[in-house]
């Protein structure tokens, strides 16, 4: 029996938007099983200078509930490659806005661990008003700053 083709993608997935769904659907079309690596809160703080709005465990639960996703795992606090090495995917999907990984450098680092996955970058952004979590945050602040929220 042939082994299932496994794809991996990674990200923060804070304040979900159509771009996230586009990347996840794209990834699932390339594999039988899609595993999503969720960036840890501390990692996001180091990279972006702020913690995510949604805590890592809640982001993991939300991503796992999405149709194209078979499983979600939290990233490593010490080594960003650790979950990829443990999963040993056939394909790695890089989102259009991801700049953490340079593809050639990622290939070289994975080859040092004996891994040779195909790496595909999603080139197309979703053309919509809120295609990034940051844009959503800016709009929330714009609408609600200095206003009392009514619940």
From Swiss-Prot:
What SUPFAM superfamilies does the record tag this protein with? Nucleotidylyl transferase
According to the UniProt entry, what is the EC number of this protein?
A: 2.7.7.2
Cofactor dependency: a divalent metal cation
Under what name is this protein listed? FAD synthase
The UniProt entry's sequence similarity note says:
Belongs to the archaeal FAD synthase family.
User: Which Pfam family is one of this chain's hits?
Assistant: CTP_transf_like
Its domain of life reads Archaea
Has keyword Nucleotide-binding?
A: yes
Class in the EC hierarchy, top level: transferase
Keywords recorded for this protein, A-Z? ATP-binding, FAD, Flavoprotein, FMN, Nucleotide-binding, Nucleotidyltransferase, Transferase
Q: InterPro entries from the entry?
A: Archaeal_FAD_synthase (IPR050385), Cyt_trans-like (IPR004821), FAD_synth_RibL (IPR024902), Rossmann-like_a/b/a_fold (IPR014729)
**Sites where the protein binds ATP:** 12-13, 17-20, 97, 125
Q: Which GO terms describe its molecular function?
A: ATP binding; FMN adenylyltransferase activity
Q: Which organism is it from?
A: Methanococcus vannielii (strain ATCC 35089 / DSM 1224 / JCM 13029 / OCM 148 / SB)
Which transformation does this protein catalyse, written as a reaction? FMN + ATP + H(+) = FAD + diphosphate
Q: One of this protein's GO BP terms?
A: FMN metabolic process
Quaternary structure, per UniProt, is: Homodimer.
According to its UniProt record, in which pathway does this protein act? Cofactor biosynthesis; FAD biosynthesis; FAD from FMN: step 1/1
Function statement: Catalyzes the transfer of the AMP portion of ATP to flavin mononucleotide (FMN) to produce flavin adenine dinucleotide (FAD) coenzyme.
